[in-house]
Amino acid sequence: MSQPAELSREENVYMAKLAEQAERYEEMVEFMEKVAKTVDSEELTVEERNLLSVAYKNVIGARRASWRIISSIEQKEESRGNEDRCTLIKEYRGKIETELSKICDGILKLLDSHLVPSSTAPESKVFYLKMKGDYYRYLAEFKTGAERKDAAENTMVAYKAAQDIALAELPPTHPIRLGLALNFSVFYYEILNSPDRACNLAKQAFDEAISELDTLSEESYKDSTLIMQLLRDNLTLWTSDISEDAAEEIKEAPKGESGDGQ
């Protein structure tokens, strides 16, 4: 039987959309990785980069949710002194962490080898550097010791590089700039345990966007105002958390044009 012909770029994009409709996100990642590896000469379109982002976000999101649930159960069993169960849970958590590491390594390699070097427009540079920061942050969520320190440092470098371009080149209301501010502030809060810096970054991004709200184009109005609402939600949560220990869910940038999210 003859080998099936390689799919064209357009066919891979179409297959990725099919996989998304079928909620087969691992395959969606595979199709979009093939597309991403063709971008040495030309950048991904906005649609293509959003498909790539959504694919990876769903694949990583399922594991991050699993890890949080298992870690929560582990803490409960530890507090009850159930050592035998804790041993089982730790092994199972390790399996999830191996999957998380593999997914993060996959997208980070793709970003470093193809997507970041091929990007020329400020918008796409910020998008990919933010994505790089996001996936290093996901590593920092579960790594420990020197590995956690390295992941946190790499997150900071990527977010800072994205921020430098965003502040210089994108308007304060741009959904990608807002999504970056949202996720960068989450990094300060969750990974670096710096609530003051998290609040300052989120508040500044929100205030700057509010002051230019009348300049928003119709197409990005919905995306921008959604992220502004998430910034405000986190600020409310964090300012109350500084005085009392709030345990509500911290918001990240949604999937799609603004980048990624939970």
UniProtKB/Swiss-Prot annotation:
The gene is GF14E. Is associated with a DNA binding complex that binds to the G box, a well-characterized cis-acting DNA regulatory element found in plant genes. Gene3D superfamilies: 14-3-3 domain. The keyword Plastid does not apply. The keyword Ion transport does not apply. It is found in: Cytoplasm; Nucleus. It comes from Oryza sativa subsp. japonica (Rice). GO terms for cellular component: cytoplasm; nucleus. Pfam families: 14-3-3 (PF00244). PROSITE patterns: 1433_1 (PS00796), 1433_2 (PS00797). Its main location: cytoplasm. Ubiquitous. This is 14-3-3-like protein GF14-E. Keywords: Cytoplasm, Nucleus. Belongs to the 14-3-3 family. The lineage of its organism: Eukaryota, Viridiplantae, Streptophyta, Embryophyta, Tracheophyta. PANTHER family: 14-3-3 PROTEIN. Induction: By wounding, drought and salt stresses, benzothiadiazole (BTH), ethephon, methyl jasmonate (MeJa), hydrogen peroxide, abscisic acid (ABA) and incompatible and compatible races of rice blast fungus (M.grisea) and rice bacterial blight (X.oryzae). SUPFAM superfamilies: 14-3-3 protein. InterPro entries: 14-3-3, 14-3-3_CS, 14-3-3_dom_sf, 14-3-3_domain.
